[in-house]
Structures are given as C-alpha cells and as structure tokens.
Amino acid sequence: MGAAGCSESFLDQEPENVIPESMIYEDKELVLSVLSNLYGRVNWGQNNGDYGSYDQLDEANKCYGSPWVIFTEYDRNSWRVRDYDFVRRVNLFLQGVRGSSALQDSEKKAFEGEARFLRAWHYFHMARTLGGMPLVGDQVFNYESGIDVETYQMPRSTEAGIYDYIISECDEIARQLTEQMTINSARANKWAALMLKARAAVY
C-alpha cells in the first residue's frame, strides 16, 4: 500500500534541454552559436537547401538527377516563407547583442556588423528575385492571436530603394567590421561589405 502526490510547480519547470533566450546573450559562445546558425541559413541564390534544382522564376517544380525522382510537385511557396523569417531572426539577434551586458563594445560592434551584412546580402537576393518589397529595418513584429494583421502591413519599397538601402547599410557595416581575414575565412569582413555594396550599385 502506498501513496503518491504532486504539486502544481511540477508543471512550471523549465525544460532542461532548452536554453532560455535571456541566457543566450550573456554568454559569448552562445552568441557565436546563434550567429553561426544565421550563416547557415543564408540564401546563396536559387537554392533552398534540399539539393533539388529549380527554374529561376518558377519554383512550382523541382528536379533531382536520379532515375527514381525526376520532377516533384512543389505546391507551397517556401521561398517567400523563408525570406522574412530570416530578416526577423537577424533582427532578434541584433536586439540581443545590443542589450547584452556580457559582451565588450568591440565584440558587439563586430557581431552587429556581421549580422547586418547577412541581412543586406539576403535583401540583395530578394531584390533580384522580387524587385521592390517592404523594408522592415530593425523592427521585430510579435504577432498575437486576434491582432489585426493590417497593423503589420508595410508599404512596398521600390527596387531602386532596396539597392540604395543595401548600399547605405554596407557603408556602415564596412566601418564595423575588421579589414583582416578572420580565422574562419567564410565570415564577413570589411571587404565583403564593400564587395556587396559594389554589386548592389551595379543594379
């Protein structure tokens, strides 16, 4: 014969396998892991990471170079879903870095420059595909059930306006980033920002 009981606090325990966001930006190594994740999400062109190839202007079909799968119907617009999700992730990162008490000012400057570069690069590829589109800047929108979605609607910028934004961003980014090659040569530096500025100016 035995007895068992429980308390309400049992349901309020924090999961042990999830790091609270409030802790992430108080640890430089965790900040680096978030930045690394952003690099891994960057759109390097007309590819969404599934190794299928797409027509440049029509993602309705994709094909693989294998005899058993040639064409696969693709009936959801995965490209557009990912566009502003990435911008939001960068903006959340910028908020966290700027508000961190664990990072030195020089570290904040460098992290911010890299994240802004990735966002500018992302906008560059979006502009090449879509032309003009809304620019959200550093804003982070937190949608809650019942909110009128029209409050989040933003005017569409012109294509020229997008490239002007990228050029302006790259001028500031170049002042934030080092001229030296980083240990990981894939990370952005001043020259990468100036390269992106030059490419945007061509358009």
Task: Identify the role of each PLM range.
Residues 5-49:
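Membrane-proximal, proline-rich intrinsically disordered regions
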Residues 143-151:
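Aromatic- and acidic-residue-enriched carbohydrate-binding clefts of CAZyme catalytic domains
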Residues 1-3:
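Bacterial N-terminal signal peptides
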